[in-house]
């Protein structure tokens, strides 16, 4: 017996620590990996993030440090918290379909380093005169028949000085589009207070004038128009009672700190913009930025787009966040993540100014596949009665609650 025990011990030593000796059996080579450690606890949300998620209204005194703190939250936590807030202010499955038409192409005197419509760059684009009122209204009718509830018009020039005839035609376009019960937005460069008042009288819903990027990075992108001139145009628009549409372009060679700076600027305006477009650079050969980017390389990683959308939602809870240029590079799954995190509008149709757009049929198929519905005209974000609904045990519970809310205000989910 002693000899047998000694033999077993010797055998165990010879086989090493990786071998298991079973009583009354031959040794077997069972290798046991180290016991897995307990998963790390989920990151604790900062007090800034907690306060943002529990917001009862809009806030205009964000500090840059606070926005940076939100932006740098671990991405899964950031997207979850922005989705939670989004459902308190918006119908989660309602996405606005917008169509953008170029009513005057090319020939712009500015040097925006991303833009094909600048006369300074050789991009192969042919400048055109302004489209006729009738052709624009026909395009708006087609957009409406395909489900768009917002029709946007863009003209490539620096400002409206000396353009009395053009302004008159634009006002006729605005009046005609509004008669179709569509929201109408224009982007016409810089405008003064009198021009803003004229557009307001014509029934303009919103005026788009993007800030593009942070104040710090802006001089690297544009030299012919200052950041303060852009802010001045937004001030004229607000004072005229027109909704402000202002966002940025990601992929201009900026850093995450510039995303923070852009959001800080728009979220501390006297009023939050009615809508915040998030563009991803579409590189166009012949432009300075288009020539810098290697062929086939994505100008901005998707996680930066998602972080920007989520941070914008948490700091501007009632604002419509629009996925604009560059959506053709996103998969359906990426778009759905954006919608979940707080984006609730897309540009759809044949073209988006000079770049390709996701077509109406493609978007309709995506909406049907994922249970999305077109947002109604003039639907806006506001704090909704979600008492007890955020604690729902499943997505079905959340959707049922939102559907009841939609019926209560005469909307379809």
Residue ranges of model-derived segments:
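Conserved short loop/turn motifs at secondary-structure junctions
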Residues: 100-103, 158, 186-188, 250-252, ...
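N-terminal pre-triad scaffold of radical SAM enzymes
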Residues: 72, 77-122, 128-154
